[in-house]
Amino acid sequence: MTKGQLLYEGKAKKLYTTEEPNVLLVEYKDSATAFNGEKKEEIEGKGILNNRITSLIFEKLQGNGIASHFVKQLSDTQQLVRKVDIIPIEVVVRNIVAGSLAKRIGLEEGTPLKRPIVEFYYKDDELGDPFITTEHIDVLELATSAEVSAIYDKALAINKVLQPIFADVNVTLIDFKLEFGRDADGHVLLADEISPDTCRLWDATTKQKLDKDVFRRDLGNLTEVYTIILSRLGGK
C-alpha cells in the first residue's frame, strides 16, 4: 500500500490517500502539544511509540468485538485505516477524578467515581473544544440521537474492555478521549487513536503518571513513560 496525496495534517498525525479509495494511511508525528496547541515541542520517537501503542490497543479491542477504523500497522510510524467521516465530538470517559473535572466539580484529583462518566466536547480548536450536552449536539446537528446513543454505549463498552487490560499490567485507566466516524455505509466506528496522548494512565502502585501529563506538567521524559506503557502492554 503506497502513500498518496496528503489529505489532512493535525497536531499529531498526517492522513494520506492510498490506491484503495476507502483505505487511508495515517502517519504519526513526533509533535507534542498541550493546552489547545499553546505548548508545543518535537520529541524524537514519540510518533513511533504512539503508532505502536495505538495499533496494539486497537488489535486488543477488535479481539474483544469492538469495531474500529483500524486495518493494520504498516511501519514504525504508519498504519492503515478505513476511511470515515469524523463526527466532530470528542468523547471523554472518566473513571477517576483528574484534570479539568477536578477543577469543575471540586473533587480532589485521584477520587474514584462510583461509576464511569461519559462527557461530550465540541471538536473545534478555535472554540477550545467546549463541553457540550446532547441538546447542543442536536441543535448543532453534529450527530443524530441514534448515533449519540451508539457512541455513548460504545464508549462504555470500550472502557469495560480497556480497564482490565491496563489493570492486568498494573496501570490504572483514569480517563481517556475517543473519537468516532461514519464509514461508507453510515456505520459509527471508533476512530483516531488510543495512546498515552489520549489517555490518563497512572501506575497502580506508585501513582506515577504514564501519559501526556508528563509533558503538560513538565514531570519528566515523555518517551520514557510511553515506552513503559508499550512494554507493559506486550509491545516492542
UniProtKB/Swiss-Prot annotation:
Keyword terms of this UniProt record: ATP-binding, Ligase, Nucleotide-binding, Purine biosynthesis
Protein family per UniProt: Belongs to the SAICAR synthetase family.
Pathways per UniProt: Purine metabolism; IMP biosynthesis via de novo pathway; 5-amino-1-(5-phospho-D-ribosyl)imidazole-4-carboxamide from 5-amino-1-(5-phospho-D-ribosyl)imidazole-4-carboxylate: step 1/2
Catalyzed reactions per annotation: 5-amino-1-(5-phospho-D-ribosyl)imidazole-4-carboxylate + L-aspartate + ATP = (2S)-2-[5-amino-1-(5-phospho-beta-D-ribosyl)imidazole-4-carboxamido]succinate + ADP + phosphate + 2 H(+)
PANTHER family cross-referenced by the UniProt entry: MULTIFUNCTIONAL PROTEIN ADE2, SI:DKEY-6E2.2
UniProt key word Secreted: no
GO molecular function, one term: ATP binding
Gene: purC
One Pfam family in the UniProt entry: SAICAR_synt
Official protein name in the record: Phosphoribosylaminoimidazole-succinocarboxamide synthase
GO BP, sorted A to Z: 'de novo' IMP biosynthetic process; cobalamin biosynthetic process
InterPro entries, sorted: SAICAR_synt/ADE2_N, SAICAR_synt_PurC, SAICAR_synth, SAICAR_synthetase, SAICAR_synthetase_CS
SUPFAM superfamilies associated with the record: SAICAR synthase-like (SSF56104)
Enzyme class: ligase
CDD domains from the UniProt entry: SAICAR_synt_PurC
EC assignment: 6.3.2.6
